[in-house]
Amino acid sequence: MAEDEIWTEKYRPRRLEDVIGHQQITRRLISYVKSGNLPHLLFSGPPGVGKTACAVALARELYGETWHSNFIELNASDERGIDVVRNNIKNFARTAPLGEAKFKIIFLDEADALTSDAQSALRRTMERYAATCRFIISCNYSSKIIEPIQSRCAVYRFGPLNATDITTGITRIAKNEGLKIEKDGMDALIYVARGDMRRAINALQSAATIAKDITADVIYQTTSTAKPKEIEDMLKLALNGQFMDSRNKLDELLITYGLSGTDIIDQIYRSMFELGLDEDVLVALVDRIGEADFRLTEGASERIQIEALLAHFKMQGAARSK
């Protein structure tokens, strides 16, 4: 394989038993392979947790060498309208499977991006071509998939991968690539990944371009992520009434890491639970963080929203000390 190959593709599982995490789901999928048949499937869960990996591995095991001819992957976020159903999906679904396959598989990724009309057309297509085609529908939020589609599928919910799963996958890759990962480097990868194996692998590949000894500093540097302790220090300054010092720390983080407003808010949210705050204080802060996050999505000033958030931390700290 080429040295510059993207690692998320290079290390994509070829078999269902190689998929990391989700053992209960992979066991069910393996049983489909053994029976030679499967229903329509709905995979729901956040990005990078193995939905596509399971779909591709399922097709590989089910079809063998003809899997490319009997399996197609479409991304619904590229074309949200009804045309993707009328053209791409129907054109593939109406042709007969090759070899000894009983049916073909259409893997529709990010299907929650489809409009309601497109989903209704998809439901009709699923019914019409059920004899020769199976659908694997992947989405981040199953609530955005219309009920008539959900009721026609076996639903599998993929949760974020835990630290053990991330460690297992990253350790395999590091060994194969001749990398040494320090403990703090692995902790940093787990922190950066947030349960997303794809993000962890991409972070490792980026770090490997500048060092073979992977430390926390290398991970945070290459992923433009602030160290958790630096975020905690900024919040502690605000809680202790040192608003201007916390503001200066914010400046330092913005310059050093080039963080976006949403990145900082996400890290603030994750770090504040490590500060030993009372539940009432946490409730008030979570409410304020949610408000700031919403305003950023609406186009508000990042700087003003984050500084307002630090000001709220200061006020909560002052109230706590009374």
UniProtKB/Swiss-Prot annotation:
Part of the RFC clamp loader complex which loads the PCNA sliding clamp onto DNA. Signal peptide: none annotated. Transmembrane segments: none annotated. SUPFAM superfamilies: P-loop containing nucleoside triphosphate hydrolases (SSF52540), post-AAA+ oligomerization domain-like (SSF48019). Keywords: ATP-binding, DNA replication, Nucleotide-binding. Heteromultimer composed of small subunits (RfcS) and large subunits (RfcL). GO terms for cellular component: DNA replication factor C complex. ATP binds at G45, P46, P47, G48, V49, G50, K51, T52. It holds the Pfam family Rep_fac_C. It comes from the Archaea. This is Replication factor C small subunit. InterPro entries: AAA+_ATPase, ATPase_AAA_core, DNA_pol3_clamp-load_cplx_C, DNA_Rep/Repair_Clamp_Loader, P-loop_NTPase, Rep_factor-C_ssu_arc, Rep_factorC_C, RFC_lid.
